[in-house]
UniProtKB/Swiss-Prot annotation:
SUPFAM superfamilies attached to this UniProt entry: Ribosomal L27 protein-like (SSF110324)
Sequence segments annotated as region (Disordered): 1-21
Organism annotation: Burkholderia cenocepacia (strain HI2424)
PROSITE patterns on file: RIBOSOMAL_L27
Keywords recorded for this protein, A-Z: Ribonucleoprotein, Ribosomal protein
The gene coding this protein: rpmA
GO biological process: translation
Annotated protein name in UniProt: Large ribosomal subunit protein bL27
CC terms in the record's Gene Ontology section: cytosolic large ribosomal subunit
Length: 87
């Protein structure tokens, strides 16, 4: 009788789910207080005026306004700022 031995199982074939990181609201766009601006790993971008940082380094707006991106210092750190909407 013809037989075929069982093949070994592959060690590959897995992949982690994407984390959907990145900029969620771009420069000049309006944002409400509490809205997420950037999801990131580590502080690639830093919180500027009217911007808070979550424990996973997510940047979010503290006030209603418009998002602005800037650089700061000699090492050109990326800064995220929310310019408050006129009251």
């Amino acid at each position: 009788m013809a037989h075929k031995k069982a093949g070994g199982s592959s060690r590959n074939g897995r992949d982690s789910e994407s984390k959907r990181l990145g900029v969620k609201v771009y420069g000049g766009q309006a944002i409400n207080a509490g809205g997420i601006i950037v999801r990131q790993r580590g502080t690639r971008m830093h919180a500027g005026e009217n911007v808070g940082m979550g424990k996973d380094h997510t940047l979010f707006a503290l006030v209603d306004g418009h998002v602005k991106f800037a650089t700061k210092g000699a090492d050109k750190k990326h800064l995220v700022i929310v310019v408050p909407a006129a009251a």
